[in-house]
Amino acid sequence: MTTRTEAVKAYLLDLQDRICAALETEDGGARFIEDAWTRPAGGGGRTRVIGDGAVIEKGGVNFSHVFGSGLPPSASAHRPELAGRGFEALGVSLVIHPHNPHVPTSHANVRFFIAEKEGEEPVWWFGGGFDLTPYYGNIDDCVHWHRVAERACAPFGADVYPRYKAWCDSYFHIKHRNEPRGIGGLFFDDLNEWDFDTSFAFMRAIGDAYIEAYLPIVQRRKAAAYTAQQREFQEFRRGRYVEFNLVYDRGTLFGLQSGGRTESILMSLPPQVRWGYDWKAEPGSEEARLTEYFLQDRDWLAASN
């Protein structure tokens, strides 16, 4: 493991600790359970799960560090020159599914890949981002989420937030439904256009921004009253989350194709979901407004003006 990889690993382990501590404090009841694991083909990780809390119905904050002699197809398909290289992949990935339909589901991920081949320069890149999936939309929450994202990106250039915001909107799109998974945030991958130190600093800025972006929303919404009908709608919308993760998500595909730990990879799935045949929201309802207004590619910073 190189000095660079050691620095990334130390940051990611600390990030996992800090996020878990903040979420436990906010929940006020449940605690994370850690499951340390090793990967027979090389590497391992720390899976931390939380559930049946006062706020969090199910969540996980995972750290993994895996390595192998060749990249799986999901990682090399869009960069065929990497085929046959040994690799190391480190990351923290998290998903939080709250009980209350008024509290959005959140997802965040930061990761580092390095691919090496004897006699050639190592190829490295960073990836990550965070995105929000509301069930009952709130403009203030969307604006806050994107404002934190913009602030995290600002030191790295005025074009960074709009570029990675647009990439997030494009990436988290459920093609067979022709709708976005949520209201977006940031997404970046294959990041090596800056030098290593700047790229690493950017990954840290995004990782550190997650709690600042999410917890104020949780605090505002966690005590809101909700009905059984609203809970059913939350479970219906969770079905879209499952569809995206199992069909399109690059991290899920990479994990399964590289012989990753199935329990950790599928940790992102919600605990209760429902599907209804050709279900449609009642016109003019809050449920209809979710798709008509909130689940659109929108400039949320402009919405605050």
UniProtKB/Swiss-Prot annotation:
GO terms for molecular function: coproporphyrinogen oxidase activity; metal ion binding; protein homodimerization activity. GO terms for biological process: protoporphyrinogen IX biosynthetic process. Its EC number is 1.3.3.3. It catalyses: coproporphyrinogen III + O2 + 2 H(+) = protoporphyrinogen IX + 2 CO2 + 2 H2O. Its main location: cytoplasm. Keywords: Cytoplasm, Heme biosynthesis, Metal-binding, Oxidoreductase, Porphyrin biosynthesis. The active site is at H107. Pathway: Porphyrin-containing compound metabolism; protoporphyrin-IX biosynthesis; protoporphyrinogen-IX from coproporphyrinogen-III (O2 route): step 1/1. One of its GO terms (cellular component) is cytoplasm. Disulfide bonds: none annotated. The keyword Metal-binding applies. The keyword Ribosomal protein does not apply. The record marks H176 as: Important for dimerization. It is an enzyme of class 1 (oxidoreductase). It is found in: Cytoplasm. Its cofactor is a divalent metal cation. A divalent metal cation binds at H97, H107, H146, H176. Substrate binds at S93, N109, V110, R111, G259, G260, R261. Residues 241-276 are annotated as: Important for dimerization. InterPro entries: Coprogen_oxidase_aer (IPR001260), Coprogen_oxidase_aer_sf (IPR036406), Coprogen_oxidase_CS (IPR018375). Involved in the heme biosynthesis. Catalyzes the aerobic oxidative decarboxylation of propionate groups of rings A and B of coproporphyrinogen-III to yield the vinyl groups in protoporphyrinogen-IX. Belongs to the aerobic coproporphyrinogen-III oxidase family. Homodimer. This is Oxygen-dependent coproporphyrinogen-III oxidase. It comes from Pseudomonas fluorescens (strain ATCC BAA-477 / NRRL B-23932 / Pf-5).
